[in-house]
């Protein structure tokens, strides 16, 4: 009988040690789980690029009496990692919109907008006096685009990852790049006794 109680106790102890725990963390806190691109990197890049663009003397001049309309192209991922560049793009767009200096057109929703306008104008279900007419949208004046690249170096003990984010703002009428900047992140990871 004592053996069964002891075995049950040991089994309960082992199983309780295998259970996972979930907790909330501060999304602004720096996460350093590994050298891969993470949430801290996304926040750093979005913050630095937004601040650089808003504080650029040329863009201060452009936005002093006008809120230019911008089309934001999804950031291109030129790293070897799977990085959700849509999240980076969304964070930058959101911060710029919240600055109150820019307005945006969302090219990712063109088909849905077209479907809605077709429904309103051709379906016969919407009062024609209240339907939004085709050809009333405004076009973008500027295009914001960029890419995220990385260089990875490893040796027996260390893995070093360098990330570089480059962005540009182009005047769509003239083709002139009005603003460009880049920000960098470098991370290093030392190999433990049992591997990466």
Predicted features and spans:
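Bacterial N-terminal signal peptides that target proteins for export
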Residues: 1-7
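C-terminal motif of bacterial Sec signal peptides marking the signal peptidase cleavage site
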Residues: 15-17
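Bacterial signal peptide processing site
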Residues: 19-22
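A short, hydrophobic beta-strand-centered structural micro-motif
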Residues: 49-53, 69-74, 123-154
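Post-signal peptide N-terminal segment of mature Sec-exported envelope proteins
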Residues: 26-48
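C-terminal binding/interaction regions
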Residues: 166-168
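N-terminal segment of the mature soluble domain
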Residues: 48, 52-125, 174-180
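A short acidic/small-residue loop/turn micro-motif
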Residues: 185-187
């Amino acid at each position: 009988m004592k053996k069964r109680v002891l075995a049950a106790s040991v089994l309960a102890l082992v199983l309780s040690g295998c259970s996972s725990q979930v907790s909330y963390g501060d999304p602004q806190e720096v996460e350093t789980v590994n050298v891969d691109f993470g949430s801290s990197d996304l926040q750093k890049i979005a913050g630095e690029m937004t601040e650089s663009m808003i504080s650029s003397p040329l863009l201060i001049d452009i936005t002093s009496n006008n809120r230019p309309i911008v089309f934001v192209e999804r950031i291109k991922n030129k790293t070897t990692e799977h990085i959700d560049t849509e999240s980076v793009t969304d964070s930058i767009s959101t911060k710029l919109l919240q600055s109150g200096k820019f307005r945006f057109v969302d090219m990712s929703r063109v088909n849905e907008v077209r479907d809605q306008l077709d429904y309103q104008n051709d379906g016969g279900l919407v009062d024609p006096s209240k339907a939004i007419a085709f050809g009333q949208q405004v076009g973008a004046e500027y295009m914001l685009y960029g890419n995220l690249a990385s260089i990875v170096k490893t040796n027996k003990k260390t893995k070093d990852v360098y990330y570089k984010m480059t962005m540009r703002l182009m005047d769509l009428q003239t083709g002139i790049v009005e603003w460009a900047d880049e920000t960098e992140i470098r991370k290093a990871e030392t190999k433990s006794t049992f591997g990466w």
